[in-house]
A protein has these predicted regions:
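Terminal targeting signals and extreme-terminal segments of soluble enzymes
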Residues: 1-121
Length: 121
């Protein structure tokens, strides 16, 4: 990946011209490397469900963004999710920061496969 590409991916969620969806959901792409991407989210009241923990939709969205960004480090074309599933192993804390790390596991033809792990502070 070129440095220009790296900067473009990092700036996609921050600063002028940032993707509105990521900004609205408080997500920032904080690191990218060939086949990996890190997305962070400082939890806000609108990120939480009625039990005070991060809403499952927030976690799913973070996973999708991190996985897609990881694929974009290897491909120059637009990517989109064909299929996705998630397993919630435990509830995240309702304060602090969440970190999602997307990793490409396999690419070929027009498809790529990735996984994302999300952790709280």
């Amino acid at each position: 990946m070129t440095e220009e590409r790296r900067q473009k991916l990092l700036q996609s969620s921050q600063g002028p011209g940032a993707e509105p969806f990521s900004q609205y959901n408080h997500m920032k792409v904080t690191a990218v490397d060939d086949g990996t991407a890190t997305v962070e989210l400082e939890l806000q009241p609108d990120s939480l469900n009625c039990w005070g923990t991060p809403h499952g939709g927030v976690l799913f969205t973070m996973a999708d963004v991190a996985a897609g960004m990881a694929l974009l480090t290897l491909r120059q074309e637009v990517t989109f999710t064909v299929s996705s599933s998630i397993e919630y192993l435990s509830a995240a804390a309702g304060t602090g920061k969440l970190t999602a790390v997307g990793t490409v596991e396999k690419t070929g033809g027009h498809m790529g496969f990735s996984r994302t792990d999300i952790r709280d502070e």
